Every structure is written in structure tokens, then in C-alpha cells.
A protein has these predicted regions:
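Catalytic or ion-coupling anion/metal-binding cores of large enzyme and transporter domains
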Residues: 15, 21-27, 34-368, 372-392, ...
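A short, small-residue-rich loop immediately preceding and capping a beta-strand
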Residues: 1-18, 30-33
């Protein structure tokens, strides 16, 4: 048996996999997040490739421009430089108290990363010699609530709604999509970083990283939770204020500005609490006769025009069919595009990234249609996209019963997702229920 562990990972699957494994093994351990890659020339970052690819397919740019983007989007090692699933889960590791304070999402090329890795090893040895320092001792329901409030502040990936409940399950704690929805409703959204914001992810660290976010929202956090430092969250934050951490981050931001000829300030990246980008979090869980068990939307990355919309259903049974229709202009303004049979039991729940980017990068479609799926999305996805529609089609969920021309109502503020009409004609909820029952029998 091992006495302790150090878990190193960076990306979409590795980081949540490590956190689930760490919770299951339940020995004293410290997580070392692998950091973020640098942005390329013109602040190019990887999630923009979907946009470039869609523009190329539509004939809006030539192959030379596409090749330029492909060759420059990943100039270093590290997680993709936007708040996608990899970045979100690195941040969650620190927010849960399982990584050293200030260690999440630093540039992977920074010499500080090696220093944090060495310190993590030393701390893991200390934890192994102490009592009551296993993950199950440190991570409580309050720790998860802290992490979810940080998730709201950063406009984190919707895939977090899959990973965080799985980690909590290993620790005997129940966290659901409703937990996210409840905490997000009145939470501040502060981080102006891609894909929902303006700047590449390395800027997050230069603005003070997770500790800076926590300082802004600390009145809503449980500051007495324990962490892998052997101290409480509140003690960690106080220590960082005193040891020059934020001054060091400011120095890195100055170098970034020098590199790109910009004059970005900390407040441009992480907004002050009273000047938040949004005051209702960043995700919403929608329910209705189309998703009785819920569906999720990142509303901070969705055009305001689509917060309430009535659209015509255009169902597809695979992403390939749908993407082809979007790129060939067979999808029109006012359509609700469905991709179904892409849930966990269907095709293993792959990401619908290229279809979502083809829609959001289209000036006309990006603000006039929606994409609804029982699959999931890349953390890079933007636009009017709704995923995790449950029950999934393979399980006989209502998404499997949608037909061409059904009227679909999306209401983000009211958290509703409903079929409200058939063949373009509005019907009562009772009539809709009867028609869906008949379709199910057929």
C-alpha cells in the first residue's frame, strides 16, 4: 500500500480522472495541475480553430489562413488556453482544496510550475505523516459548494456538471445539476477569459488565478474548510496576500502586455465583485416536457437574443448529418437543430464541438437558431447550445420523439425547455402530452 500520492495532470480527461481516482483511493495526496499553454500570435488560441474551419468550409477564408491558424494555435505545452474543460478542472482541483494555493492554470512554460511540483511532493510527505488528512477528511459538501461558486465566477465548462458529481460520489457526497443551478442563480460571473470572454487563459494566472477569484467572492465562501496545506481556505488566502503572490502575478502580466503591445489590467481580466460581468452565474439547468430530468446551457456564452425563443424542430440522429446540413446552408433562421442518440448509452457522449462552432461562427445562424442534444459540448463551445438533455434518446427520452416542424420553446430565465406545438401549430400541454404518448406507442 502507498502512504501518500502526488497526482499530475492537465487536460479534459486526465484531471477529472485523477480527482476521481484520488477520492477513491483516499490516501493523503496533492494534485499538481499541469498549467496552460501560451497564446499564439495575435493572441490566437485553440478554440478558434473551429471558427476558422467553419469559415473555410463556407469559403470565407482561404486554405493559407486556415493553415496559419492550425500551425500557431498551440505554441507550447499545457492545457488549451481558454476556460474549457481542462482549465475548469484544474481550477476545480484548487477550489476543492486538493491543489496548492495559486497552482492552478499557471503558464506551463513558467519555472514556477517546477517549484510548485517540488512543494507538492514535500507536502504529500507531510500529509502522510499526519492524521485525518485524507481526501475524505478534507473535502466536504462545503468544499464542493465553494468550487461551484468559483465555477460560476469563471464561466466554467458544462462538462463540470458530469465530473464534479462523479468526484463527490466517490466521497459519499451528493452533488447534482440542481446544486449547480441553485448556487449559480445568484452568483457573480467575473472572469473575462475565452471562450465566453476576451482574453487567453494564461491571463487568468497573471490576474491572480483562483485566489484572486476567491478574494472577490469570499463573503459567499466557506472559509473554514480544510485544504492540503493543512490550513483552512481562509488562512491560505491571508498567507497569499502577505507573501508577494499577487505582486509576482502582476509582474507576469506586465511581461504579457509587453509581448502583445497591450495594456491589460488585472481588473480587465477578473472583474471586481461590484462590477461583475453577470449576477446570475454562468450556467442554467432547464427542464420541461423535452427534458424532464434536465438539460444544461452556458448562458454566459449564449446571445441574449436566444434567452427566450420559439423555434422549429430540425432533428438529426447523428452529429455528422447535422454538421453537413449546417455547412451546406440547409439549416435556416428560426430552427432548433437536434442531435440525438449521442448520450452516454448512445454513442458514449462525444463533444458536439464542430457543429456548435459552425453555428456560432455564422453571423446569421449564431443568433437565430439553437442546438439541442443529449450529448455534450466541448468546454470551448459558444452560442445557443443546450446539452445533456435527459433522459437521453436511447433511454426513450422525449428528445427521441421530436419530429420536423415541432415548436420548441427555450426560456433560460424561467429554466424551461418545452415542446409547445406540432407541425408549426401551438398546442396545449395536455395535447402535447397525448401526441408524445401516441408517438411513443408508434
Amino acid at each position: 500500500p502507498f502512504d501518500g500520492g502526488v497526482y499530475l495532470s492537465s487536460c479534459d480527461k486526465g484531471m477529472p480522472g485523477n480527482l476521481i481516482g484520488l477520492a477513491r483511493v483516499d490516501i493523503p495526496a496533492v494534485v499538481v495541475p499541469g498549467g496552460t499553454m501560451n497564446a499564439g500570435p495575435e493572441m490566437l488560441t485553440l478554440e478558434q480553430l473551429g471558427m476558422y474551419s467553419a469559415k473555410f468550409e463556407r469559403g470565407e477564408i482561404d486554405e493559407e489562413k486556415l493553415d496559419w491558424a492550425k500551425c500557431n494555435a498551440c505554441p507550447s505545452c499545457g492545457a488549451c488556453s481558454f476556460i474549457g474543460t481542462a482549465s475548469t478542472m484544474q481550477i476545480m482541483a484548487e477550489a476543492l482544496g486538493l491543489a496548492l494555493p495559486g497552482s492552478a492554470l499557471m503558464p506551463a512554460t513558467s519555472p514556477d510550475l517546477l517549484a510548485y511540483a517540488r512543494e507538492a511532493g514535500r507536502q504529500a510527505v507531510k500529509l502522510a505523516q499526519m492524521e485525518h488528512m485524507r481526501p475524505s477528511d478534507l473535502v466536504t459538501k462545503e468544499s464542493f459548494e465553494n468550487a461551484i461558486l468559483v465555477h460560476a465566477a469563471i464561466s466554467g465548462s458544462t462538462n463540470c456538471l458530469l465530473h464534479i458529481p462523479a468526484i463527490a460520489h466517490e466521497l459519499g457526497i451528493e452533488i447534482t445539476g440542481d446544486t449547480f443551478d441553485r448556487l449559480h442563480r445568484n452568483a457573480r460571473y467575473l472572469l473575462d477569459v475565452r471562450p465566453a470572454g476576451r482574453w487567453p487563459a494564461e491571463c487568468f494566472y497573471y490576474a491572480g488565478g483562483v485566489p484572486a477569484i476567491m478574494e472577490e467572492i469570499k463573503d459567499h465562501l466557506h472559509l473554514n474548510v480544510m485544504t492540503v496545506t493543512g490550513k483552512t481556505l481562509g488562512e491560505n488566502l491571508a498567507e497569499l496576500r502577505e507573501n508577494g503572490f499577487y505582486e509576482k502575478c502582476s509582474g507576469w502580466l506586465a511581461k504579457f502586455n509587453e509581448r502583445y503591445g497591450t495594456s491589460i489590467t488585472k481588473e480587465d481580466i477578473i472583474r471586481p465583485y461590484d462590477k461583475a460581468i453577470g449576477t446570475d452565474g454562468s450556467i442554467a439547468v432547464l427542464r420541461g416536457n423535452l427534458a424532464p430530468e434536465g438539460a444544461v446551457i452556458k448562458h454566459t456564452a449564449c446571445p441574449k437574443e436566444m434567452f427566450h425563443a420559439v423555434l422549429r424542430a430540425r432533428p438529426f440522429d447523428s452529429e455528422e448529418e447535422c454538421l453537413d446540413a449546417v455547412l451546406k446552408h440547409k439549416v435556416q433562421k428560426g430552427d432548433a437543430v437536434f442531435i440525438r442518440y449521442e448520450g452516454p448509452k448512445g454513442s458514449g457522449m462525444p463533444e458536439m464541438f464542430y457543429t456548435s462552432e459552425a453555428i456560432s461562427s455564422d453571423k446569421e445562424l449564431g443568433k437565430s437558431i439553437a442546438l439541442i442534444t443529449d450529448g455534450r459540448f466541448s468546454g470551448a463551445s459558444t452560442g445557443p447550445v443546450i446539452g445533456h438533455c435527459s433522459p437521453e434518446a436511447v433511454d426513450g427520452g422525449p428528445i427521441a420523439l421530436v419530429e420536423e416542424g415541432d415548436l420548441i420553446e427555450i426560456d433560460v430565465k424561467e429554466r424551461k425547455l418545452n415542446i409547445i406545438g406540432i407541425a408549426g401549430e401551438r398546442k396545449s400541454m395536455e395535447e402535447i402530452d397525448a401526441i408524445l404518448k401516441e408517438r411513443r406507442q408508434n
